[in-house]
Amino acid sequence: MVRNLTKKSFALSALVAASLMASGVMASDKTEPRNEEYKDKFSKQYNSWHDTAESKEVVDMLEEVPSLVVLWAGYGFAKDYNAPRGHMYAVTDVRNTLRTGAPKAATDGPMPMACWSCKSPDVPRVIEEQGEDGYFTGKWYKGGAEIVNTIGCGDCHEKGKSKLRVSRPFAERAFETLDTPFAKASKKDKQSMVCAQCHVEYYFEKTKDKKGFVKFPWDQGVTVEAMETYYDNLEFKDWTHKVSKTPMLKAQHPGYETWKLGVHGQNNVSCTDCHMPKVKNDKGRKYTDHKVGNPFDRFEETCGTCHEQSKEFMVNLTKERKVKVADLKARAETQLVKAHFEAKAAWDAGATEAEMKPILTDIRHSQWRWDYATASHGVAAHAPDEALRVLGTSVDKAADARIKLAQLLAVKGVKQPIAYPDTSTKAKAQAALGMDMKKMNADKADFKKNTLPKWEAEAKKREATY
């Protein structure tokens, strides 16, 4: 039945539409953030994307590796760090982590708006509506009712289409820095560049005109040394270490950078070749599997398209590489934990800033290199040789710091061995740093109970106007 509009009802409808447009609640012309809107047109891709929900196990990495608590002392990751899960959990996990705190207002909390930047297609929507200044200004809480749809279709595809796109301006600027603008890239390169909007190293700028903006530190290249030099020239630090007072760098997840340096990247094997292969449905029709995960789960469609070796051979080879990387990673962690506490002992013994500067530089560089290698998820497959090389330099620099500390402590009259606190478990390490985990967890529980439902209600109301 056709609805007959009176002049009065028509005028009212027009007024409501104008009001919605003025208030900025209309969906963006470029981005449809609601993943379910793609379900009918791209059903096979949508259903496989939805299957990333199967990656639901929560693995507490601080329980697995308690030394991480010490390495990140004074930084949010010492509170809480879980292994990454499937794309379906991106928004859920950033809401639940202790790192984002328990803010109660838009001006409250430890984290900036930029912490949403890789979690949702709502991010490009808000940037398109408000501009980057509008999006990046303020605290993380501000985006709570806006950033609600998890990583999905609109992050990598043009609105309502399968055509790939880079949806984040800061990523496009980074590609231009490497002289590879997305518009001029090959189809194969684009298949990796859409992933590189998020699976990269980044930091939050502190310049006057781009305060809080996300930036990839690629101005001098993507190697660990190039980015280290870039940060050093800026005198940039993510935080000051609570124990050693070192101006620290926190690597995020430079998967794209390490992939480029490895055998797959050097041979132009894209991210999607291994993690989102072409597969056949029950009718024999090919489509791109959007269940991003372990290539060995789809061996014939991934590794098997290039490698003649058996799945068993390739799995065992990767396991061997993981063991080698893990061994060197653990050695670096042991050296760094001791270096941090020995640096504290030197400060306590009266060391000056001038005496400590070269030591803290060694610690900074060592931990940055350790983090660059270990935060690059999948590095044992992507670039095992580069991982071992970088971790080797991390161990060397930590050892350099400890040799200098031993000499300085002797000069300061410290003749007894340094007493290291018990950091053998997550709880003991956090207690040694004076962290009130009981309060943090209680505050987070209150936040989840009282704030998250408000965000969901506001988002539902807004999306009903699209």
From Swiss-Prot:
A GO cellular component entry from the record: outer membrane-bounded periplasmic space
Q: Which residues bind heme?
A: C115, C118, K119
State the species of origin. Shewanella sediminis (strain HAW-EB3)
| Comment on bound cofactor | Binds 1 Ca(2+) ion per monomer. Binds 5 heme c groups covalently per monomer.
What EC number(s) is this enzyme filed under?
1.7.2.2
User: Which residues make up the binding site for heme c 3?
Assistant: H87, C195, C198, H199
Q: Where does heme c 4 bind?
A: C271, C274, H275, H382
Tell me, in one coarse class, where this protein mainly resides: periplasm
Gene expressing this chain: nrfA
Q: What protein am I looking at?
A: Cytochrome c-552
Q: Any idea which UniProt keywords this protein has?
A: Calcium, Electron transport, Heme, Iron, Metal-binding, Oxidoreductase, Periplasm, Signal, Transport
Q: Which reaction does it catalyse?
A: 6 Fe(III)-[cytochrome c] + NH4(+) + 2 H2O = 6 Fe(II)-[cytochrome c] + nitrite + 8 H(+)
Belongs to which family?
Belongs to the cytochrome c-552 family.
Q: Which GO terms describe its biological process?
A: anaerobic electron transport chain; nitrate assimilation
